[in-house]
Amino acid sequence: FPDVTGDLRLLRFLRGFDHSVPLALAAFRDMLATRAKYNMDAVHEKWAHVPCTHRSGFPHQDAVTRNKPGLSTAGFSLSGHVVAYEPLRLHQYTAILEDIGEESMLEFYLAQCESRMAQLHRLSLEQGRMAKLILVIDLKDIKVWQLTSRRWARYDEAHQRAINRSMTEILARVYVINTPGWAVLFYRRLKWWLPANTARKIRLVGTDYRKELLEVMDEEVLGRIMGYPGNNGD
């Protein structure tokens, strides 16, 4: 598949590893091994052509929407990147695994990832430049306990981390909005463990995020974020 082993995907690996051919090649081989482990070519056949939205009908979509809602494609940035939105206060990590189990969550995630990578590939070809993802993570009213699910952590380590590593260089920017003070302190410690390329892309913003987001997206896209259920326009 061109979006899996074509020039654009190879370029993502090169850029993601600062143009180090040995590191990029090792990561690319790891990606192929991960794809083989999860039979992702079969997933690609079924889901790569499906638009990557919260209404796409991926496996177990209803359960995911109940327990881990958001906008997988809220719109597009002024420069053509995909904008996604995740309101973490609404994410119930233990509940979703109790609801559908690890295998079903993995089935959903694989389908969504193949759809996402195909989406970015198509946009890159249309725009003549590498399309990426702008992720808006909303910490409004978040409680620390919501982020500490041991069961989810085990599932994530066993499955999603390797899958995420296979999607090298897809992030253009991460905006963490409505960031409380405790999260700022936590991030100051965490960022030293992050790859420098990743840390450069993360921007923490308080409740006055509107002006900054309008530098990268239009009013319509921002409106979908601010108008998300429970946001009350702020």
Q: What would you call each of these model-derived segments?
A:
Residues F1-D234:
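Basic, amphipathic alpha-helical/coil surface patches used to engage anionic, phosphate-bearing ligands
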